[in-house]
């Protein structure tokens, strides 16, 4: 069994390294395109953003607040009663690889409590949810469902106005230059924190709307193939971890576990 465990651990580590490389590759593509655009021959100028090179001359350096249709808002600061069924209530754990994973929700809340949450914030398609508290601060996901749900305090909601294409902003918020801004802006207490007003003050490089759409379409296609590869590798890792657990069960109990 020791030899089997070693082999499983080795394969898992190799797969995880591949996943890390794919994620770095994905971020490098996103950063290149949201800061340079799709036209290599365009005139450029100094972006004046720390850690960022020149950008196309006709693009703008804007505050996040200027491209939002509402102020950045986080979820309720109290812990609600959770149930086995009802309205999904999500927190930071549900933000996985740029998407919302409802299987990792915090639990269910009552319709009555969700009505209260809705007075503060009601999720809509194309909203961007950002983790603002804890080890994964800065990670984001886009709302892509009409399903009713709500968010807890570690998440902040960002809603774009008509000047900004939400998909473009979704990618820009994953770029190295934006993540670097967040890292320089968050505060530390018991854990790293990014305030909602701080998010509003961060800078974003904004092309004209038609270019934003073109970039978003390009990155949707490019990132979809990378995400598929990442998902396949993660599936392998999960299967191997479950297999190892079943072997441990067998060692401890002398019985095969049905998985």
Which sequence ranges carry the predicted segments?
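A short glycine-rich beta-alpha junction/loop motif
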Residues: 132-133, 148-156, 167, 187-213
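Short coil/turn segments at secondary-structure boundaries
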Residues: 43-47, 76-85, 104-105, 184-186
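Low-complexity, Lys/Gly-biased intrinsically disordered segments
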Residues: 60-101, 115-118, 137
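Non-catalytic DNA-recognition/assembly elements of restriction-modification systems
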Residues: 47-74, 201, 205-209, 213
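A short beta-sheet element
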Residues: 91-92, 111-174
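Short, structured beta-strand/loop micro-motifs enriched in basic residues and often containing a Trp
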Residues: 45-46, 89-93, 105-114
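Amphipathic alpha-helical coiled-coil/heptad-repeat segments
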Residues: 1-41, 205-259
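Hydrophobic pocket-lining residues within nucleotide cofactor-binding pockets
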Residues: 34, 38, 95, 100, ...
């Amino acid at each position: 069994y020791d030899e089997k465990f070693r082999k499983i651990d080795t394969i898992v580590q190799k797969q995880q390294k591949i996943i890390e490389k794919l994620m770095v590759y994905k971020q490098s593509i996103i950063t290149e395109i949201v800061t340079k655009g799709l036209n290599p021959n365009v005139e450029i100028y100094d972006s004046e953003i720390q850690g960022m090179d020149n950008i196309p001359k006709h693009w703008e350096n804007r505050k996040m607040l200027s491209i939002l249709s509402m102020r950045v808002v986080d979820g309720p600061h109290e812990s609600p009663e959770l149930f086995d069924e009802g309205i999904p209530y999500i927190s930071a754990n549900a933000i996985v690889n740029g998407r919302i994973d409802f299987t990792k929700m915090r639990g269910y809340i009552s319709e009555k409590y969700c009505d209260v949450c809705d007075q503060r914030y009601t999720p809509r398609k194309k909203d961007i949810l950002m983790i603002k508290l804890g080890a994964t601060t800065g990670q984001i996901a886009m709302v892509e469902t009409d399903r009713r749900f709500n968010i807890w305090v570690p998440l902040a909601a960002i809603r774009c106005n008509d000047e900004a294409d939400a998909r473009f902003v979704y990618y820009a918020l994953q770029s190295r230059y934006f993540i670097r801004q967040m890292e320089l802006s968050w505060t530390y207490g018991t854990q790293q924190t990014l305030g909602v007003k701080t998010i509003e003050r961060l800078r974003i490089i904004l092309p004209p709307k038609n270019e934003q759409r073109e970039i978003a379409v390009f990155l949707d296609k490019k990132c979809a193939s990378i995400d598929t590869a990442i998902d396949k590798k993660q599936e392998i890792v999960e299967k191997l971890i479950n297999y190892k657990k079943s072997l441990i069960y067998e060692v401890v109990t002398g019985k095969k576990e049905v998985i």
